From Swiss-Prot:
HAMAP family, per the entry: Ribosomal_bL35
Organism the protein comes from: Pseudomonas putida (strain W619)
Protein family (similarity comment): Belongs to the bacterial ribosomal protein bL35 family.
Presence of the UniProt keyword Protease in the record: no
Protein name: Large ribosomal subunit protein bL35
A single BP term in Gene Ontology: translation
Top-level taxon in the UniProt lineage: Bacteria
Alphabetic keyword roster: Ribonucleoprotein, Ribosomal protein
One term of GO molecular function: structural constituent of ribosome
A Pfam family assignment: Ribosomal_L35p
Length: 64
């Protein structure tokens, strides 16, 4: 049986850390003129994945 491949799209978007999976915020790429400065500031940086999604992402990345 060959090795299972990781989902390359998920590998580009998520990073495994000691406390969970790190990811960037969505809705921050283009057409930002309509968005308020406060909202753009809140979407800056990265955050940890919600606990309910951890199992799905771990399966996609083949992480135990």
């Amino acid at each position: 049986m060959p090795k299972m491949k990781t989902k390359s799209g998920a590998a580009k978007r998520f990073l495994k850390t000691a406390t969970g999976f790190k990811h960037k915020h969505a809705f921050k790429s283009h057409i930002l003129t309509k968005m308020s400065t406060k909202r753009k500031r809140q979407l800056r940086g990265s955050s940890l994945l919600h606990p309910s999604d951890v199992a799905k992402v771990a399966r996609m990345l083949r992480v135990r």
